[in-house]
Amino acid sequence: MLVNSKEIVMKELLDRYMDQLHMACTCQVCQNDVLALSLNKVSPSYVTDFKKIAYTKAELVDKQKNTAMLVILAESAAVVSESPSDLCQTKQEEAFIN
């Protein structure tokens, strides 16, 4: 089984720093959009076993790499907040109310 370890790490970072990203909406659609945008900006890091993800996580001890990934998440969160998908739950609820 091939796994993109960066996807798992980015998801964990998104979950950990969700409150600090100040997203307009935190529905699953918007979270997935942020992850997709972020992952398209980083090089994939494939592993063949979930146990090997620890190496990618260990890279985050390097504050510069950790900060770089957080900046990518913050930029992606800003883009999604500015222009949410039509599938965004908050956007759909607002359209229903109006």
UniProtKB/Swiss-Prot annotation:
- The set of disulfide-linked cysteines is none
User: Which superkingdom is the protein from?
Assistant: Bacteria
InterPro entries (UniProt xref): ComFB
**Gene Ontology terms describing biological process:** establishment of competence for transformation
Question: Which phenotype arises from disrupting this gene?
Answer: 10-fold decrease in transformation efficiency.
Q: Does the record carry RNA-binding as a key word?
A: no
- The coiled-coil segments of this chain are none
Q: Name one Pfam family in it.
A: ComFB
Expression induction per the record is: Part of the comF operon, encoding comFA, comFB and comFC, transcribed in competence media (minimal salts plus glucose) once stationary phase is reached.
* Sorted UniProt keywords: Competence
What does the function comment of this entry state? Involved in transformation (genetic competence for DNA uptake).
**Name the UniProt record assigns to this protein:** Competence protein ComFB
The source organism is Bacillus subtilis (strain 168)
Q: What is the lineage of its organism?
A: Bacteria, Bacillati, Bacillota, Bacilli, Bacillales
What is the name of the gene encoding this protein?
comFB
